[in-house]
Amino acid sequence: MNRIALAVAVTLALVGCSRSPEPADPASPAAAPAARTAPVALPAAPSDTATATPSFDCAKATSDAEKWVCTDEGLAALDRQLAARYKRAQTAPDEVDIAAEQRGWIKGRDACTRAVDPRQCLREAYQTRLVELTVSSGGVPASATGTYRCDDADKPLKVVFYNDIDPAAAIVTLGTDQAIVFPIESASGSRYGREGVAFWEHQGEATLDFYGTALRCTADR
């Protein structure tokens, strides 16, 4: 299986990168489709007492990240969802690769406790891994694919939208760099983002802020 790196950024620490296959281009038009909006931001402060039920035993939580998950039902729900999806992925022919990726992802998730907003970082880490496992499983059709001409002609922009998976997402490829982004409520056009990345498209015009690189782009016709 052809697998490519997907960037996962945090504010103060780099979350461990995972790998997933190059998504196939659907026959859909390039314009970004309507999508479900991203979840509301999680509460900012943790509790000292386990109040949620993730896939693991909170009494045996060893990392600070696991302890954060144990105090927030939203994160715990994502953890349960990821545990179920990872279990299904373990039946794949490249199970060894997936196990190694998961260990790397756990290290990245644990680094989220050093981020400015640990809960946002944890939420994005879980959502990103869910998308990676879903897309890498194969047979997941994209909602649409957009290709764009940007200010930096040396770095073509491609955005593949997956709005019928949970969580809904898009994979942004700028040159050889990639990031998974999530729908954000927008008054007009389609907006996706994550910490460090913001993509907005409306009627063939797009803007992208990719970890400090700001571009204006036009959709290919």
Predicted regions and their residues:
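Amphipathic, heptad-repeat alpha-helical segments
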Residues: 57, 65-96
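Short, exposed beta-strand-loop hairpins at the edges of beta-sheets
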Residues: 122, 198-216
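Short, structured interface segments
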Residues: 122-139
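Post-signal peptide N-terminal segment of mature Sec-exported envelope proteins
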Residues: 25-53
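Sec-dependent bacterial lipoprotein signal peptides
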Residues: 1-15
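Bacterial signal peptide processing site
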Residues: 17-20
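Tryptophan-anchored aromatic micro-motifs
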Residues: 141-156, 192
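Central antiparallel beta-sheet cores of small beta-barrel/beta-sandwich binding domains
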Residues: 168-193
